[in-house]
Amino acid sequence: MSLHLYDSKTARLQPLNPVVPGHVGIYLCGATVQGSPHVGHLRSAVAFDSLIRWLKRSGLEVTYIRNVTDIDDKILRKSTEAGVPWWAWAQRYEREFTEAYHKLGVLDPTYEPRATGHIPEQIALIQRLVDRGHAYSDGAGNVYFSVASQKDYGSLTHQRLEDMRTTEDESQIDSATEAGKKDPRDFALWKAAKPGEPVTASWDSPWGRGRPGWHLECSAMSYRYLGEAFDIHGGGIDLRFPHHENEQAQSHAAGWDFAQLWVHNAWVTTKGEKMSKSLGNVLSIETLTQDFPAAAVRWALSTVHYRSAIEWGPDTLPDANAAWEKFSAFVTRSIEAVGAASPEELQLTPAELPEAFTNAMDDDLNVAGALAAVHEQLKLGNIALAEGDSQAIKRQQILVRSMLDVLGLDPASPQWANAGAGVSASENTGDDPQKHALDVLVGALLEQRAQARADKDWSTADQIRDRLAQAGVQVADGKDGATWSLG
């Protein structure tokens, strides 16, 4: 296929050449369910959702794995402080992540394995590494990976081992596991159970009771579901080191080819800083959707290139919502005029979509170029509506909706059917032709207003609202978009 993606390991665009022709295997590092999700957490899921939709639209079968880390030091510490069993704590926040994914229209993965559900696979991998001379036990129940034994260590992040002080994330370092290392740069594969920890938070192993290190689960579970070699490993850019570097080291040391391409998304930032609970600058989905539809949040996350940071500020959601309203208005009016396209009609192949859109998506998911192509078809659709050309209206509806569906943003899809904007009449028009005519006329003005808001032409947007008010039409901007009523 013609899709090229930026490979973090080689630092260049690489063609996607599936290991198994016609099939793409993807592993995405999912959530560590220690707390409620915020918009920064969800960017990876949304970015990879667009990739998966494009792969499927391109006729490829996709096996998509997104793991859940449901046990680690932070989960144990926070659950203990709250007086809640660690597993109940993890389940609570796993549910919150799932609800947030669904709220943003993210497709479910093929499998969503939990770390605690794959302890035997992780123990087997540790034993394999020990047998191959890449891991050792300290005799106190801890097992470490010998970084110096893996000659390509550092190749993912372009670092030299001799320049490294540690290969552990600061949050994973503790004195109990540091003491037994032969080399301070080695990292834990198995952590011995500590006094005072819940007995349910450890498992029997050849080295004593304990639990896996953070990096091990992804190597074990990607092998379990995707095999020795798969196509794409993804995650946030902050996971490149040490997590992904250590994953690669484990898997290569086990004798597996592992990931062919490494695809990393950038952060969501506020005032130039990564969105992080420790900085107190996070925004939950619940907070954001109090004033705006979830579709606007999805728009904000989907329409910036995945390798570019999203600077989240006061205008982010208003701008995204204005753009969403513009497209939603056209789709609603086109459906009113000629009816809704069938699901089958909307599944246009890349060859059937505008060439500019297909070329942009194949170019490392260039959403800016893809959206330019959608805007061009939107203009033609509005012309068709103005001219009353039913055939052209239907064709443009199919094109616009089919392209937006690749981004998970088809306004008439079941996901967003109740989150439309721009032409939602608050009164049923029924079969009354006068009410229907009024709905269409008001809808046309609200579409112009949505365009003005998208262009930040606030004066024109206010003038349209005021003109409608003078005619007895009240406009309300709510979280589900602009609605109107008489009175």
Residue positions per predicted region:
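Short Gly/Ser/Thr- and Asp/Glu-enriched loop/turn motifs at secondary-structure junctions
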Residues: 108, 138-140, 477-481
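Short, glycine/charge-rich beta-strand/loop segments that flank catalytic centers
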Residues: 68-73, 95-97, 107-122, 140-149
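Short phosphate-binding/catalytic loops that engage adenosine nucleotides
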Residues: 60, 134, 473
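Alpha-helix C-terminal capping/helix-coil junction sites
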Residues: 56, 102, 130-131, 263, ...
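Alpha-helical recognition segments enriched in aromatics with Gly/Pro capping
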Residues: 1-34, 49, 120-336
